[in-house]
């Protein structure tokens, strides 16, 4: 834990809509989160301290746009932006066997991550089967740009806490819904 912290910033959220036809909701946060003094986060005394609070990006935001261009068809676009941040990456404390198929870091390090933009699209079409039953088909793509952490640890000696950014790679989905 740090000896004290300064956290400040600004958050902006907004929504605009035109009936059922279209709506846009957006939010953005710009913040600064720093310890007042160097904080030593590793048990390894040779690892430098930091004033940056781990896992707290200075910038992040989101948007959701939905539209229904016709009575039976609607779609949504959404996205989440996560700015760069500092994330601790701990080296294994156990001795790594020489025949291990994986490479591991040898010293704890504070990693300055890349930023990520997770973009999604979903399409829906509703068929009216009769006055009491409707069938909706939907499909889309989550994380279209495949924004994903590329340096995940692997194997038995991995740092299981070392992850950041979107947790799901590009994913295609389809669905069906029956309702009244």
Model features per residue range: what roles?
Residues 2, 14, 49-53, 65, ...:
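Outer-membrane beta-barrel proteins
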Residues 12, 26, 65, 77, ...:
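Hydrophobic, well-ordered secondary-structure elements that form the walls
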Residues 18, 45, 100-101, 132:
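Intrinsic-disorder/low-complexity loop/linker signature
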Residues 1-91:
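Gram-negative outer-membrane beta-barrel transporters
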